[in-house]
């Protein structure tokens, strides 16, 4: 798997989750699946990633939803068994110790925090959020951030707090913010 396949073609929402066969994770994966067409209409590829093996992903994909599985999920799930991707994105939840050589060594079995990265068509991270392990994310918020980025790219207007598609945005100037605030 490589994010390079999307550069110049699609936006990407890449999200990390701790582990297959757990508790909050299947609710998130199903929530992304339920909104997948909305992401696709916005030219966004959705990609999930955990530190599990591809074999674990396959088994979980074949387990029925009513048994905690993710049967029916159709977007790619990346296996980060080496934990390199999670480490590179800064989402690896690990305790580290320093060995005699001064190297950081992780203890236990690190997993990924619930990181979400919105990557533009040029391959730049434009938004990210990292939730602690017990805190599920809001897929509608991910869609809202896609809308905000695409609005900015199309119109050059910045999107204020709580902005949603179809609402007023503003020019990134003193006059723009003054005008916006005087009407809101």
What are these regions (language model features)?
Residues 1-184:
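Chalcogenol-based redox active-site neighborhoods
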């Amino acid at each position: 798997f490589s994010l390079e396949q999307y550069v110049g073609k699609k936006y990407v929402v890449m999200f990390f989750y701790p582990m297959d066969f757990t508790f909050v994770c299947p609710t998130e994966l199903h929530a992304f699946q339920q909104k997948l067409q909305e992401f696709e209409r916005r030219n966004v590829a959705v990609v999930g990633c955990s530190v599990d093996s591809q074999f674990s992903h396959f088994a979980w994909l074949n387990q029925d939803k009513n048994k905690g599985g993710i049967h029916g999920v159709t977007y790619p799930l990346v296996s980060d068994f080496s934990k390199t991707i999670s480490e590179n994105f800064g989402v690896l939840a690990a305790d580290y110790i320093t060995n005699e050589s001064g190297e950081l060594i992780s203890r236990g079995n690190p997993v990924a925090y619930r990181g979400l990265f919105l990557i533009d068509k040029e391959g730049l991270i434009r938004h990210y959020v990292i939730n602690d392990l017990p805190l599920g994310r809001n897929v509608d918020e991910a869609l809202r951030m896609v809308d905000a980025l695409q609005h900015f790219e199309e119109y050059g207007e910045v999107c204020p707090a709580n902005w949603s598609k179809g609402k007023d945005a503003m020019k990134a100037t003193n006059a723009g913010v003054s005008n916006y605030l005087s009407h809101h």
